Amino acid sequence: LGTVPTTIVPAVAGMASAQGDAELMESLSVVPAGMLVNAIFLSVWIFLPSRLEGLPLNRSLALTAMSALVVWAVVGTVAVLAIGSAQDGGASPESIAAAGIAMTGAFGLILGWSPGEAPSGSESVGASVLLARGGMAATAIGASVWVAGLGYPLVAGLASVFPAIFLTSMVALWVSQGPSVPRGAAAPMLLGGGSVGVYAIVAMTAIGDYGMAMGSVVAWAVAVVGWSLPSYAFLNWRSRAVGSND
């Protein structure tokens, strides 16, 4: 539930003020694919650390974080190019967004079906981490609005979902709790993050029908009820099922 749509709300409002309606639809169409890119980013935190166990923890953390960011940049670039090609071929923003949501959901269900060990942390998150998280999220929002104003709606859509909160969460959990906690948290975050894509596809219609403020509320409510809560129920069910078989 910690992955309900948050930073995407002001990002969409900012992008709407910086570009026209058609360009906003293009930006929103990238958001679900961007969350798939974020899911791949998080999967690096699941699979790579176990292959770096012979290294000191700080070096392992640095390599994991850098690798995840490189993967995000490469896959994000491929996604933007693919979406641009699909648009040139006549695909609608809505169909592109729906495809992104479907792929994110499938990826999340696969990794969530057999959840790994997710030990609870014993340390609270410090104020400096919260400040860093907020600062990076604000930077991502500002960057998306700026890029939208430059006339690059697809890049703006990807920038709006830069995994600032995911990155700071993974690093903070690793530093304070050890590598096993972020590994266990990544899969639930991966599936839950799909709610941002649902927000985007609903916002395509809701903002036009109800205006920015009420349309955002409608999109947020649909995303939480239609994605976040079912994802939470699914992950709880799989966790209990796997636990009962151990």
Where are the language model's segments positioned?
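C-terminal ends of transmembrane helices
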Residues: 40-56, 110-122, 170-181, 228-236
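Selected transmembrane alpha-helices and immediately adjacent juxtamembrane segments
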Residues: 111-155
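Cytoplasmic-side transmembrane-helix entry/capping segments in multi-pass membrane proteins
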Residues: 2-5, 53-70, 95-101, 122-136, ...
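Structural signature of hydrophobic alpha-helical transmembrane segments
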Residues: 2-5, 23-40, 93-105, 152-166
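Transmembrane helical segments that form the transport core of multi-pass membrane transport proteins
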Residues: 136-179, 183
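Small-residue-rich transmembrane alpha-helices that serve as helix-helix interface/gating elements
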Residues: 99-106, 163-165, 214-229
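Hydrophobic alpha-helical transmembrane segments in multi-pass integral membrane proteins
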Residues: 16, 73-87, 139-150, 196-213
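Membrane-interface helix-loop-helix junctions at boundaries between adjacent transmembrane segments
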Residues: 17-33, 40-98
